[in-house]
Amino acid sequence: MYQPSLEEVKSLAGQGNLVPVYRSINADLETPVSAYLKVARGPYSFLLESVSGGERLGRYSFIGTDPYHVVKTGPGQPGGQVDPLTLVQDEMDKYRLIPVDGLPRFHGGAVGYLAYDTISYFEPRVPFMPADPQGVPESVFTFVDTLVIFDHIRHDIKVVSHVHLDGDIDKAYAEATRKIDDLVKRLGQPLDLPPELQGPATVSTPVEATSNFTKDEYNKIVEKCIEYIYAGDVIQVVNSQRFSRKTEAHPFQVYRSLRSINPSPYMYYLDLDGFQIVGAAIETVVQVQDGIAATHPIAGTRPRGKTPAEDDALEAELKNSEKQRAEHIMLVDLGRNDIGRVSVTG
């Protein structure tokens, strides 16, 4: 039922101090959304979902809850105003993972976010920003060693926990399998939706979104950025503004609506003790695996044509667009420079 077995785990003990154990169950009656609603507990949980839609289908979706450790940084936060990645690295350095067959490369670890404000830790020339008026931390990372993994190719669910090998292995294995069985039990129960999540996933309200800038203030920022570009001080600027909109919709209903209208390979819902982050992306910003760093930026889109001839025409339009070509060159240049700062050739 559990893989690897207790005897197999004991035989691996000399290779590290942490080994995953998992149990597979059928996924034909479950979706990542329903599974998340069944298993999420407490103030922290997440759903990282690859949604089937359009022409793309990511292989895995991940659900985590009940983290064993949480890092929060920023002004007034428990972790203080420090480089959050050093705290993440300190926690990860405690473990020497022993890989096992049958699992994706991610089956536990740190899940969270870095706010734009954290740029000051990585680029010392950038001054520190004032504390966020919304009270949102600069970073939050939850550390999970037990989670649910959907395999959309094999149509199964793997419920994973981890055995700590530093102490009594029998007790650690029993605790890991107990956590697995608890999640399997939750998944097997009927879905009991609270009232705020019943009905269609709609978030429409009569209130318009408001920005933290007036139009004139924002236009002045744009003009200043253009001056910097002409002066050769910058090659790329992202002008940001915060839009706010009141709604009575539950945050997970917002996620469900986004999931419906914009299904993407990388969708995420993070519940972080008092606030939530909802989003979707079609590209891998950065990935590191086996010591290889990669980035896959995407720029330039056109709608699909109704015929192959229309598709060909739209493709040619993209390839011949001076603006799109310039953006691609810029993205390749930026990606090469950023990866080059933390990598070696060969």
Language model: regions and residue ranges:
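Extended alpha-helical targeting/anchoring segments
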Residues: 1-346
